[in-house]
């Protein structure tokens, strides 16, 4: 993509910027929550591109909030320490020992690295976690596996979000970078799936958009048939399809559904392997992923994007 941009003439670059104007106007002063994950977290060029996207959005008046996972880094650290990692139903099995490593990697490594990349462009990013200033409260989450609810350790569901604890950072013109660890009323600390946390935070902040980066192009109705990629889908229609999705995709799509049902204008699952995918999704008519919208927008014809609707 960089090579393509470098080959554009000055006139062509000006056209690209002009085409983005309606979208820049739409999102100005609006909160956009972005879940940072997938290859965008491990490839150095993609990491730098993501950080630049966040600074670009902030510079043009959008108010980005980043929620990050740390799956690859957590798995790598567990392997280095000789601890076996396990997933059930798309969620990491989290013993007290694993939780301490998750906590250390999320806030001490992934979050700090991203804050540093963003701040290489100026003093924009502030690292925080769900434990700070009462941002998140959580309770134990039981995961349904083969029709049975299963305890997978210190994995939690968010029960409350104190949005005001972030608004001070946002109103100061900063970019919050949020690690997804949350305390519970029972005195325990829980590992929160970052997709789930991003959706809950987007709803609590009355965000205009939720974007979730992943390692696929979006939602497929007939994987691996690439022609079955869905561009736009109604939230309730997607809810009906959740049980048929792969385990790794369920938390992402569940988060999108919940966010839209609770007032977020639209949620997007986009390909984090594409440099500047956030800008492509937000600031172009075509976008690069799957957009989840209220079902009323599917029925009254107000969705104008691509041609593969479900």
Curated annotation (Swiss-Prot):
Pathway: Amino-acid biosynthesis; L-arginine biosynthesis; N(2)-acetyl-L-ornithine from L-glutamate: step 2/4
Primary location class: cytoplasm
Annotated CDD domains: AAK_NAGK-C (cd04250)
Sites where the protein binds substrate: 70-71, 92, 191
Entry keywords, A to Z: Amino-acid biosynthesis, Arginine biosynthesis, ATP-binding, Cytoplasm, Kinase, Nucleotide-binding, Transferase
Keyword Amino-acid biosynthesis included in the entry's annotation: yes
Catalytic activity: N-acetyl-L-glutamate + ATP = N-acetyl-L-glutamyl 5-phosphate + ADP
EC number: 2.7.2.8
Function comment: Catalyzes the ATP-dependent phosphorylation of N-acetyl-L-glutamate.
Database matches in HAMAP family: ArgB
Family assignment from sequence similarity: Belongs to the acetylglutamate kinase family. ArgB subfamily.
Protein's name in the database: Acetylglutamate kinase
Designated gene of the protein: argB
